[in-house]
């Protein structure tokens, strides 16, 4: 909990400081913040939803992307060394946030009953097949989407944390053997540093993929009647 609060405080402080006195020609932290915000707007929101709907749902996609990004980053910060998303609670909350967003998008456009019908009923199917397809579509749309969002983020960050722990624990173990095994500490240390750099890439990719999937699910809800 303390790690999550600390990361949230760092994220809020970053954007408050960066955008406190915005300039027409950005520089410093404002430039970094605007580049990051433009990335979400152009490459996630507008890319998937188009300009009109993309701007409308920026209020969902921007906090989703940056919360995942900053919470993931704690896995490579010294003395923290574990992502808040390596535990089930936070990924589940983030997935539920996306879940509420895409259901809201569909209900807002079609109304509750039409949206539910459009989401689970595939037109022009034989009546008998509806008995099979409707439960599967309901499971896929309303159960598996938040579940897979949670599991994907949790598993990727947890696996990365475990590998880093193993590599640096092995480094410590081998180094203090003071025999032939000591030389291996250099190998595991180098592997740990290399994997830390790789984990930085994973941190960004997982934030991007998570926000991208939320955008895709919102888009599917907005076009639920287009089977």
Describe the residue ranges of each PLM region.
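Selective transmembrane helix interface/packing segments
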Residues: 1-227
């Amino acid at each position: 909990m303390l790690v999550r609060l600390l990361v949230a405080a760092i994220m809020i402080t970053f954007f408050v400081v960066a955008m406190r006195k915005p300039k027409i020609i950005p520089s410093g932290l404002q430039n970094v913040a605007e580049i990051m915000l433009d990335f979400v707007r152009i490459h996630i929101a507008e890319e998937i939803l188009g300009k009109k709907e993309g701007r409308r749902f920026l209020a969902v996609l921007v906090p989703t992307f940056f919360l995942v990004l900053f919470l993931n980053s704690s896995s490579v910060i010294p003395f923290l060394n574990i992502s808040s998303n390596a535990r089930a609670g936070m990924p589940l909350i983030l997935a539920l946030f996306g879940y509420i967003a895409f259901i809201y998008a569909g209900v807002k456009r079609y109304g509750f009953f039409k949206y539910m019908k459009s989401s689970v009923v595939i037109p022009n199917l034989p009546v008998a097949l509806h008995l099979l397809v409707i439960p599967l579509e309901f499971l896929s749309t309303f159960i598996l989407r938040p579940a897979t969002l949670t599991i994907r983020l949790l598993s990727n960050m947890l696996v990365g944390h475990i590998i880093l722990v193993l590599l640096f624990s092995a480094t410590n173990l081998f180094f203090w053997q003071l025999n032939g095994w000591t030389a291996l500490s250099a190998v595991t240390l180098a592997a740990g540093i290399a994997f830390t750099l790789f984990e930085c890439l994973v941190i960004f990719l997982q934030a991007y993929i998570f926000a991208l999937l939320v955008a895709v699910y919102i888009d599917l809800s907005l076009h639920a009647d287009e089977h």
